[in-house]
Amino acid sequence: MNIIRVPVLSTNYIWCLYNYKNECIIIDPGEATKVLDILKKFQFRLRAILLTHNHIDHVNGVAPLIQYFPKTIVYGPTETKNNGSHFLVSEGDDFVLLQKKFKVLNLPGHTPGHIGFYSAPWLFCGDTVFSAGCGKICIGFAQYMYESFLKIRYLPRNTLIFSGHEYTLSNVNFAISILPQDQSIINYRNKIIKLYKKKQPTVPTTLNLELKVNPFFRCGNSNIKKSLNLPCDLKEEWQVFSELRKKKDSF
């Protein structure tokens, strides 16, 4: 199975998975027009849509796509029940599409019911993990988002992370502001700048890389605590995570 990246809106990515039979799966269609263009160009037959959460920039294309392909099956969390989901799924559920098994992970934080879809080595995590960053957190859900990061942290290191947006340069600039002497982040920023100048994407990323350059995966780091003016002996890493995200919100 192969994957096509479909950039839409200003920063969104829709993901199109397809097989040798020209059957395809669409993940988080924030709009329909460009997806329909891809389907027409490659003569793909849409079999399923996967939704990670209910924000409009991830679901707005569902209804138009269903109009064109009425037999399409839609999988999503409970919060997407009014946006076309036929099967409401959560952690513990798995299913097979195009002969590939997908495992559902609960990843609350960006929204209360946010989920991800894992099909080794791919993770489609919506707006949970971004390269060098994390999604905005709904009020009161910082600890849940931290726990979602922990869940992702323990996936295989070769996991490819497919995020819902292209935010990497902003994220890596923030990471440098927190850890200005970190050589891994400095090197990564230099790489990202080159990619941006060439108008090339930075997603997907890998879990192995994110564990090195993403401060939200490194909340036990004493230099991060120092940068946030937090006690070095603070044990609750989710509190570090929360302060880090607050700092990013005002960056």
Curated annotation (Swiss-Prot):
The protein's Enzyme Commission number: 3.1.2.6
This protein's pathway: Secondary metabolite metabolism; methylglyoxal degradation; (R)-lactate from methylglyoxal: step 2/2
Cofactor requirements of the protein: Zn(2+)
InterPro entries referenced in this protein's UniProt entry, alphabetically: Clx_II_MBL (IPR035680), Glyoxalase_II_hydrolase (IPR050110), HAGH_C (IPR032282), Hydroxyacylglutathione_Hdrlase (IPR017782), Metallo-B-lactamas (IPR001279), RibonucZ/Hydroxyglut_hydro (IPR036866)
Alphabetical UniProt keywords: Hydrolase, Metal-binding, Zinc
Residue ranges that the Swiss-Prot or TrEMBL entry lists as coiled coil: none
NCBIfam families to which the protein is assigned, alphabetical: GSH_gloB (TIGR03413)
HAMAP family associated with the record: Glyoxalase_2
Protein name per the record: Hydroxyacylglutathione hydrolase
Organism: Blochmanniella pennsylvanica (strain BPEN)
Lineage of the species this protein comes from: Bacteria, Pseudomonadati, Pseudomonadota, Gammaproteobacteria, Enterobacterales
